[in-house]
């Protein structure tokens, strides 16, 4: 079959595509208007793991590594050049996550690497400036300024931001389908300008350093390579947003004036941009175009790379995005080529091929353009949100840049006709085409699926709204005591000296009096066992608050929920906690094994913190030998949300934070600590459950399950007992429901093979034998172990590939 592709443009996308065609055995020819393929156009370039994997497939990655510089340390700095947060070791992390370094180097060096990787150089033709394009049912013809003409079946425009091929495609489409391309003719804009340049290295900047400086309406970033050079980028917001036809061009005089105007930028406390510019070897001032074109092809013409998705440089994602698009186009063309008749594909087949290419790539490409745009405006502190996020959010997240980059890397396209490289199969963030930018699960969908939590919340609110109990509680407060089986019990009306705090807790501690001072064994058994089981729920919330995947979500602040739970009842709060968790923590947030990871110093502190702040005061409040002592301890226990937060923080300070090292070398270092802590709590809860079952004269159902809504006609003790039963039913019911949702996520991702019948049998057996708290703890541990050892069914790993062979 005679089939030829004409590529116009010998940049990153064009040369990648040429190499891919050569590997696939598809005839092509590449036309480049410049006299050589390694001309010094542009300053530096970055390659991310998503692009590195494709170069590895083509055999060019190792060649690039010999001349490129891996990114060693990443620093985010304020306008004074001071670090916003501790620097991160980027290269070990990137390689651990994906198998590839984050690298940068000169653009011309990458072009030379791609050029050298192509065996048959006769297909690469320089000095070929396109002056006309014609299409017919039989094929496409390209005429060049030197008088030569070339014919083929497909024309690919890989000729950059101001693509000539795209212009000819628009003209041809306007002739046959007027108006189709009109939106795209206004799609490109520019709001920022940037001075790109190369300078001699400064002594204070080590090889492999990268610094990003955040400032109002301007930003800058630098990279230091292993050849004594610093590549710099100085960005500033322009006076307005320029549309495509009016985007400004700048002269060298403009560039020099721009550099002088920004000479005061503090790259570091002891280094200004002016110091760098004094040793500058080259520089160019350009407007930063941004574009997301909607029509990637028409007829037999298709565009790739910057000609269809143009992004700002702040994420360093442009080159890898172009490489990905080239791979996606090759995949579609190869699939068509392999299933075409002997006489070659028809124009209809070609159009379908191009549509499939755009469908496979557009969502990710658009998401990466948007992410780059957001990063540009974030680093330029565009508004109050950006300012507050940089000042408050980023230090909490710690590795914001790496986590954001992983969203771009994970769902990357690869060449489907070539095997995935071994390096790409061993990362802790396995590539997965169903995850990452543009592939996120809908939060609205998860919110709708989580409506049963709100139903439980409504039940809890209705069942625990005992107006009679509240009224009688006020009467007891005013009278200064209550009558119980133990006789008259005077109230301890003030324990904390601060009036507001004392009144707040004094009024609420009356709710616990029947459980602590009645001789009703059923009430005591229910209160002790339920309170111990609640401690396991509190521990799980504490563990979840220190999980990397839960950064900047409501799960990170369990104190808010536990405090309100003490005020209004945990049964009213837990469904709200769980639906928020479920919405914000789909299985995709665990795409990298490091996202499951917890901060080890905090994980070690959870068990002692819970024991000191929750279980010791609780035990003393129930079993202290004197009534006055029990009342005092009850006041202490009531404020356990505050004490837990304080003790967890203080105990965690005893141990150093190792999360940076653990993300690279210790992904499961926290697991033994978590297992030990939860096992201790489960054993304790199971022991009390068994004790209450064996010693109680009443059935489990009578002791722990409500038989009716609290009645206004019942005695105060009976009313409070019924309220507690409903409160615990909502608390434990919503927790089991939450675990069910989490198991559903695991099964949907193919990470759990157990059937629902098996899960139900295990759950019911654990509940009956060990109690709700122990069953919850074991179920949560089961899930934790799966997250630590299993990967998503669509992840490109050695294990998954072996199963598909």
Swiss-Prot record:
Pathway: Secondary metabolite biosynthesis; terpenoid biosynthesis; Mycotoxin biosynthesis. Coiled coil: none annotated. Residues 1-20 form the signal peptide. Keywords: FAD, Flavoprotein, Glycoprotein, Membrane, Monooxygenase, Oxidoreductase, Signal, Transmembrane, Transmembrane helix. GO terms for molecular function: FAD binding; monooxygenase activity. FAD-dependent monooxygenase; part of the gene cluster that mediates the biosynthesis of the neurotoxin verrucosidin, a methylated alpha-pyrone polyketide that inhibits oxidative phosphorylation in mitochondria and thereby causes neurological diseases. The carbon backbone of verrucosidin is synthesized by the HR-PKS verA, and further modified by the other verrucodidin cluster enzymes. This is FAD-dependent monooxygenase verC1. The lineage of its organism: Eukaryota, Fungi, Dikarya, Ascomycota, Pezizomycotina. The gene is verC1.
């Amino acid at each position: 079959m005679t089939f030829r592709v004409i590529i116009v443009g010998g940049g990153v996308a064009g040369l990648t595509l040429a190499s891919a065609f050569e590997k696939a055995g598809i005839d092509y020819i590449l036309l480049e208007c410049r006299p050589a393929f390694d001309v010094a156009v542009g300053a530096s370039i970055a390659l991310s793991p998503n692009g590195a994997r494709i170069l590895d497939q083509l055999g060019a990655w190792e060649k690039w590594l010999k001349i490129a510089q891996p990114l060693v340390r990443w620093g985010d700095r304020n306008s004074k050049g001071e670090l916003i947060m501790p620097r991160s070791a980027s290269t070990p992390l990137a390689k651990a996550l994906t198998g590839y370094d984050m690298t940068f180097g000169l653009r011309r060096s990458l072009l030379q690497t791609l050029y050298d990787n192509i065996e048959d150089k006769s297909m690469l033709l320089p000095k070929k400036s396109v002056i006309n394009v014609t299409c017919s049912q039989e094929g496409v013809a390209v005429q060049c300024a030197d008088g030569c003409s070339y014919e083929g079946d497909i024309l690919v425009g890989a000729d950059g931001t101001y693509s000539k091929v795209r212009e000819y495609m628009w003209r041809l489409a306007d002739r046959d389908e007027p108006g189709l391309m009109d939106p795209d003719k206004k799609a490109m804009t520019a709001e920022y300008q940037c001075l790109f340049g190369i300078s001699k290295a400064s002594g204070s900047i080590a090889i492999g350093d990268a610094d990003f400086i955040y400032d109002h309406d301007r930003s800058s970033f630098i990279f230091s390579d292993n050849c004594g050079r610093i590549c710099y980028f100085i960005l500033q917001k322009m006076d307005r947003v320029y549309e495509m036809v009016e985007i400004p061009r700048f002269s060298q005089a403009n560039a020099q004036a721009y550099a002088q105007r920004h000479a005061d930028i503090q790259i570091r406390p002891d280094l200004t941009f002016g110091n760098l510019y004094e040793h500058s070897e080259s520089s160019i001032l350009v407007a930063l175009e941004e574009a997301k074109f909607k029509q990637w092809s028409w007829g037999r013409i298709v565009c790739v790379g910057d000609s269809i998705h143009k992004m700002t440089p702040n994420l360093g994602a442009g080159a890898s995005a172009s490489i990905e698009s080239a791979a996606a186009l090759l995949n579609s063309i190869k699939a068509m080529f392999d299933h075409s008749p002997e006489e070659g594909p028809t124009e209809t087949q070609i159009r379908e091929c191009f549509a499939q290419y755009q469908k496979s790539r557009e969502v990710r490409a658009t998401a990466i353009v948007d992410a780059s745009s957001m990063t540009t405006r974030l680093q330029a502190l565009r508004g109050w949100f950006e300012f507050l996020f940089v000042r408050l959010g980023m230090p909490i997240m710690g590795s914001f840049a790496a986590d954001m980059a992983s969203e771009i890397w994970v769902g990357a396209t690869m060449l489907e006709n070539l095997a995935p490289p071994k390096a790409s199969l061993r990362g802790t963030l396995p590539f997965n085409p169903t995850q990452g930018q543009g592939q996120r699960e809908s939060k609205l969908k998860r919110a709708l699926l989580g409506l049963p939590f709100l139903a439980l919340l409504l039940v809890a609110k209705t069942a625990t709204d005992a107006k009679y109990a509240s009224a009688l509680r006020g009467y007891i407060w005013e009278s200064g005591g209550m009558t119980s089986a133990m006789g008259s019990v005077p109230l301890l009306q003030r324990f904390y000296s601060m009036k507001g705090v004392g009144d707040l807790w004094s009024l609420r501690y009356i709710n616990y009096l029947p459980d602590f001072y009645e001789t009703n064994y059923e009430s005591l058994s229910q209160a002790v066992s339920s309170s111990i089981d609640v401690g396991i729920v509190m521990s799980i919330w504490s563990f979840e608050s220190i999980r990397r995947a839960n950064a900047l979500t409501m799960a990170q602040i369990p104190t808010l929920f536990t405090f309100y739970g003490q005020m209004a009842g945990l049964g009213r709060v837990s469904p709200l906690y769980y639906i928020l968790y479920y919405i914000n923590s789909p299985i995709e947030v665990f795409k990298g094994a490091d996202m499951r990871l917890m901060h080890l110093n905090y994980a070690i502190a959870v068990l002692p913190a819970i024991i000191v702040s929750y279980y010791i005061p609780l035990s003393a409040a129930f079993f202290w030998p004197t009534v006055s002592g029990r009342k005092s301890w009850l006041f202490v226990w009531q404020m356990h949300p505050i004490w837990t937060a304080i003790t967890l923080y203080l105990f965690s300070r005893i141990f150093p934070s190792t999360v940076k090292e653990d993300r690279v070398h210790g992904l499961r270092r926290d697991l033994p600590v978590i297992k030990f802590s939860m096992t201790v709590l489960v054993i304790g809860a199971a022991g009390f459950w068994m004790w209450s079952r064996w010693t109680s004269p009443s059935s489990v159902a009578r002791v722990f399950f409500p038989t009716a809504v609290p009645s206004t006609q019942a005695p105060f003790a009976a009313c409070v007992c019924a309220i507690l039963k409903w409160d615990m039913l909502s608390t434990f019911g919503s927790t089991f429901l939450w675990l069910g949702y989490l198991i559903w996520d695991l099964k949907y991702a193919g990470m759990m093979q157990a059937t629902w019948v098996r899960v139900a049998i295990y759950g019911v057996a654990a509940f009956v034998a060990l109690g709700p708290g122990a069953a919850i703890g074991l179920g949560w541990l089961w899930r934790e172990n799966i997250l630590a050892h299993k990967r998503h069914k669509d992840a490109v790993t050695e294990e998954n590939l072996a199963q598909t062979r």
